[in-house]
């Protein structure tokens, strides 16, 4: 799967996460902003990484701004951003979730 454009999914509202995805060249790089990064940062990054790998993306840059999202929300927002970035949103791959 190839990133064709920079894409965003999610909001900056409470209990949500905003994911911005763009083309990368050296693996999955995540820039995470979160008030709970110290406690949950590793888990948030793990969920994002696993979702991207299941979707077939290995070289991407992620800017994630977390506002207390649950894992299911993180997965859904990551998948939505990935589908927009690869321009495949008309063919949802819900098995990734």
From Swiss-Prot:
UniProt KW keywords: Cytoplasm, Phosphoprotein
Location within or outside the cell: Cytoplasm
A single cellular component GO annotation: cytoplasm
Organismal lineage: Bacteria, Bacillati, Bacillota, Bacilli, Lactobacillales
Keyword flag Phosphoprotein: yes
Gene name per UniProt: citD
First-listed, main subcellular location of the protein, grouped into a coarse class: cytoplasm
Residues annotated with O-(phosphoribosyl dephospho-coenzyme A)serine modification: 14
Protein family per UniProt: Belongs to the CitD family.
Protein name, entry field: Citrate lyase acyl carrier protein
Record organism: Lactobacillus acidophilus (strain ATCC 700396 / NCK56 / N2 / NCFM)
Function, as annotated: Covalent carrier of the coenzyme of citrate lyase.
């Amino acid at each position: 799967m190839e990133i064709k454009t920079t894409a965003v999914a999610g909001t900056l509202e409470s209990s949500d996460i905003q994911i911005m995805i763009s083309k990368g060249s050296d693996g999955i790089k995540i820039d995470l902003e979160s008030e709970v990064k110290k406690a949950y940062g590793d888990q948030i990054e793990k969920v994002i990484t696993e979702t991207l790998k299941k979707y077939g993306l290995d070289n991407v840059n992620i800017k994630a701004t977390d506002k207390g999202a649950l894992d299911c929300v993180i997965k859904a927002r990551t998948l939505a951003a990935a589908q927009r970035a690869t321009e495949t949103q008309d063919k949802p791959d819900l098995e990734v979730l």
